[in-house]
Regions:
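Catalytic machinery of carbohydrate-active enzymes
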Residues: 1-190
């Protein structure tokens, strides 16, 4: 893993390492408890979580409507795409697709300040934490997204648990180091 994330570009070794999930599955298999890695798809049924458990604002997704989740923050600074550049990504998305609904995921003082500003400037954006009461509701909403754009962060892994495709943006870490979300497509990594 250290060879893959080494800051010295000449010493980097680009080799896919097993994911954490694969490592755990191997341990359980050696203990006599094999795990079928294809068995788990989502914590919810194929149609997603029960939208009736969400505030009314989130209950009415039209069949042809696109819902995009954006989770631009992470616990570690090196994993965060620069805020102003992410704002430009969202602004471009809103300009090119004014009919899309954009849901901003994150909790904390910086997230609140940032997302309150973004929602004032871009009415298609909704700051999820202002309306959602708990993690279960966030997971239900995530299960109805068409895609989540996320850093290497908890939100990438949460979206993976509800079988939502994730476009993941990597900074200080690398998907080849085994950190990619469950069942996520390597082609969707940046």
């Amino acid at each position: 893993r250290h060879a893959l994330v080494n800051k010295n570009m000449k010493k980097k070794v680009k080799q896919q390492l097993p994911t954490s999930f694969e490592n755990y599955a191997d341990v359980f298999a050696k203990l006599g408890f094999p795990i079928d890695k294809n068995e788990f798809i989502s914590i919810f049924p194929p149609e997603g979580g029960d939208m009736m458990q969400l505030p009314e604002l989130f209950r009415d997704k039209k069949e042809d409507e696109k819902w995009i989740g954006i989770a631009p923050f992470a616990a570690h600074q090196g994993k965060i795409y620069p805020k102003e550049q992410m704002k430009e990504v969202v602004r471009t998305m809103v300009a090119n697709h004014p009919d899309y609904s954009i849901f901003l995921f994150g909790r904390g003082k910086e997230e609140e300040e940032t997302f309150n500003q973004w929602t004032k400037e871009m009415p298609q954006c909704t700051f999820v934490s202002q309306h959602i009461e708990n993690l279960r509701q966030e997971l239900i909403l995530m299960s109805h997204l068409d895609v989540m754009v996320s850093m290497d962060s908890a939100n990438m892994h949460l979206a993976s648990l509800v079988n939502t495709p994730v476009v993941s943006i990597w900074g200080a870490t690398h998907p080849m180091a085994g950190f990619l979300g469950w069942n996520q497509d390597k082609d969707n990594t940046i």
